[in-house]
Amino acid sequence: MKIEVIVPGKISKHLKSAFDFYLDKLKRFCDLKISFVRLGGDINKTSKSVILNNEEKEILNKLKGRSFVLLDLYGKQIDSLEFSSLLKNKLLEGNLCFVIGGPLGISENLRRMSEKRISLSKLTFTHEMALILLLEQLFRGFKIINNEKYHY
């Protein structure tokens, strides 16, 4: 099972240990690839539309026409059981790709192109935190799929 997560930017030093923790935990469940793409520009010097357009181009280049699930503030909120069901169903179809927007969100074009949009919360998170939360939910989802205990 291959899963790819496409996200603008990179992981910061203070979140690196959580990032590495979940990457290690997920190894036994899937072949996970995190694809970091360039941020669209300096938010102090470049307009939001230009930044989102630049990030869209980077993301589309990585997608290469594949369908994807978008993590989006305006997406459907689902619980962990629904997420594990989504994970199981998508993996039965083949590979799975998630896209996370950058610091300014995601372009309307990518929003329209997404196969499915889900929200991690009504709260707004940085793209780095969204990545960590997604990795945790992937781990939790695989534990649920495999009928394994998660909380000890």
UniProtKB/Swiss-Prot annotation:
Catalytic activity: pseudouridine(1915) in 23S rRNA + S-adenosyl-L-methionine = N(3)-methylpseudouridine(1915) in 23S rRNA + S-adenosyl-L-homocysteine + H(+)
Transmembrane regions listed in the UniProt entry: none
UniProtKB keywords: Cytoplasm, Methyltransferase, rRNA processing, S-adenosyl-L-methionine, Transferase
UniProt: S-adenosyl-L-methionine binding residues: 71, 101, 120-125
GO molecular function, a single term: rRNA (pseudouridine-N3-)-methyltransferase activity
GO cellular component: cytoplasm
Protein's cellular compartments: Cytoplasm
Domain of life, per lineage: Bacteria
Main localization category: cytoplasm
EC number, UniProt record: 2.1.1.177
Signal peptide: none
Disulfide bonds listed in the record: none
Keyword match rRNA processing: yes
Complex formation: Homodimer.
Similarity section: Belongs to the RNA methyltransferase RlmH family.
PANTHER family in alphabetical order: METHYLTRANSFERASE (PTHR33603), RIBOSOMAL RNA LARGE SUBUNIT METHYLTRANSFERASE H (PTHR33603:SF1)
UniProt xrefs under HAMAP family: 23SrRNA_methyltr_H
Function: Specifically methylates the pseudouridine at position 1915 (m3Psi1915) in 23S rRNA.
Protein name listed in UniProt: Ribosomal RNA large subunit methyltransferase H
Lineage: Bacteria, Thermotogati, Thermotogota, Thermotogae, Thermotogales
